Amino acid sequence: MYTSASLFFIQIVISIFNSHLAVLYSIALCYSVQGRILGSSTTNFVHDSTIGVKSSWSRHLIHGINIFSFSISLFLIFLTIPLFDIG
């Protein structure tokens, strides 16, 4: 689910803005959601990063870090939108 949504988002950003920064931020977004740059794994980064972690607070911390990195990626994308020449 995350993979197809990330790739679809990358296509939209590249087609609208056609910028190197948009490409880099889209790849960063895909990386933070899935865990691999344009990879084809069946599990997302949250599940990959919590394998072998037994304590619940550690799992919550890892989930929080992943959500934080995803939020930062979105913030960077929307922060740079006014910098693009849309006209």
Swiss-Prot record:
Highest rank taxon of the organism: Eukaryota
Name under which the protein is recorded: Uncharacterized protein C19D5.10c
Location, primary (coarse class): membrane
GO CC aspect terms: membrane
Transmembrane segments: 7-27, 64-84
Topology versus the membrane: Multi-pass membrane protein
Subcellular location field: Membrane
Keywords, sorted A to Z: Membrane, Transmembrane, Transmembrane helix
Keyword Transmembrane helix: yes
